[in-house]
Amino acid sequence: SFSIDGKRFLVLDCGENNILRNVRSDGGRARFRFDDDKELAARFEEVINNTDIVLNPTHTALGELGVMTRRMAWLSENGRYYFTTSNAIQEIVDHKAKKTKIKRNRLPLDSKILHYAFHNGEEIEPVCDPQENEKDNDPYRIEYYEVE
């Protein structure tokens, strides 16, 4: 974690959001995965309660969006912001092949699954239209959000 201009950031790299789990018996609500370890749960609670902005960059676009959306919402509760972005190249692994094959698909830059932003448990929209660049086969998209 780190701070910029008084805002406290927490970075979860890619699959580190699996520190949360979704409880089916509670409507799929996200919770800290290791809540049976009281000391670890208390440490996580202290970290998350002292975070203003959660950044969760991912290597590939998120799967299981219902599960992940609940986690994004949970991480943004109580005034926090949550931001994630992904590469535009999606890897699809074929486990049924004799040798593992990885197929790479390029997602359109306007694909919803490349960027998510949440605040107070709700998805938020960028403050302006995304800026896109697709020259030299190096695609990227930039979105801007207002953070209070």
Predicted regions and their residues:
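Beta-strand-turn-beta hairpins that frame and shape the catalytic cleft
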Residues: 1-18
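Generic detection of short hydrophobic beta-strand segments and adjacent strand-loop junctions
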Residues: 2, 143-148
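CN hydrolase (nitrilase-like) catalytic-core segments centered on the catalytic cysteine
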Residues: 17-142
